[in-house]
């Protein structure tokens, strides 16, 4: 019991036994170094500019004229499936795969009369890359620095 009291008075840590003042001065090294190449940095910059353009285009759309129409008027076009069965089967012409492939922005550009005012779709992370999504960061071991050798 006296040993614990002495450790607390001296400021020693339990795991290493080093004085706390030494641990506070020591700046720990990172476990690994993340290197982001120039190509990846350019890709990140391009995705940020594309996101800004997408947001501007969504804000500039004239949605005010369409807000007065009832929501039942604005519906996606449907067509009958090619399968001939007793039940009528319908498919959306704008399927989920189209949304995931092109994003909401190009769907708006293709058929602006079909979609009502902007709503938060499940594909939000796919239509415009954000800070948290669609980043590619490669970790690479830093180059070893060689000391100059002297040849005689």
From Swiss-Prot:
Name of a matching Pfam family: CDRT4
Tissue specificity comment: Expressed in fetal skeletal muscle and kidney.
Polar residues bias (residue ranges): 65-74
Compositionally biased spans, kind Basic and acidic residues: 1-11
InterPro entries recorded: CDRT4
Disulfide bonds: none
Lineage top rank: taxon: Eukaryota
Residue segments, region Disordered: 1-23, 60-89
Name of the molecule in the record: CMT1A duplicated region transcript 4 protein
Name of the encoding gene: CDRT4
